[in-house]
Structure formats: C-alpha cells, structure tokens
Amino acid sequence: CERALPTPWALFLRYTASKRVEQVDWVNAACLVLRRNVWEQLAGFDEGYFMYCEDVDLSLRVRLAGLTIHRAEVKVCHFGQRDSRKSLKHFRWHVASLLRLWSSPVFYKACRLLQPIPDGRHRI
C-alpha cells in the first residue's frame, strides 16, 4: 500500500480534505459494506457464480430493489497474489461468469433501469 511522506502539507490534507463519496452502479466485493437486512432481503451472493461477477450481480439486485450504492474515496490494501490473468482456468471461469451475468434477467432488467452514459454505453 503506497503512503505519502508525512510532510506538513500531506498531514494537513489528510485531516482536512473531505473524502469524496459518489453514487455508482456496482462495487467490487473485495471491500464491501452492506446492511444486514439488505443482505438477507436479497439472499446474499448468487452461488451460481464461481469466483467472478457475484459482486456485479449483487450490486445490480441492490439497484433493482430501489436502493443506492455509494463508493467512498478510500484505499484498501490487499497483499495477496492474483494470478487469474495468467491462468487459463481462471480466464475460463471469468468468461463463464460474464456469460451467465449477461444472459441473466437481473442484468437485462438493470440495463433497462440504468441511464446510459453520454457515449451511449451503460455504466456497467
């Protein structure tokens, strides 16, 4: 995790700058905070997804339930190794999860709900 040197200016900004919070369509579940009642209402992650896209699916179900998702400007450090870009097996799992997501009723309904961004694509 990268950290700035503790200069007077860096410390001033650290304690006085407001953290930006923005509304988004989905968040990565590597660091997710969700109200328990929402988790239970939506029955958590769809276990049909293996390793990939379960966070997108859950986020879209949150949105379809009429709730909002916010992303705070914070940093989380993960020191684990990720080899999925080098592994054909992980690539296949990723593609299978994407195909499952893109063909799901949740994705179809969410695409109709979410507003397109200016270039015509959806913000998914």
Predicted features by range, described:
Residues K19-R20, Y49, S87-L88:
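Generic hydrophobic-segment detector
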Residues Y15, Y49-Y52, Y108, H122:
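Sequence-level detector for tyrosine residue identity
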Residues A29, C53, R85-K89:
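Residues at secondary-structure transition points
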Residues E22-Q23, A30-L32, R36-F50, V56-C77:
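Catalytic donor-sugar/metal-binding loop of nucleotide-sugar-dependent glycosyltransferases
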Residues S59-I124:
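Active-site-adjacent helix/loop segment of glycosyltransferases
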Residues C1-L42, F91-H94:
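Acidic/His-rich active-site region of diverse nucleotide-sugar glycosyltransferases
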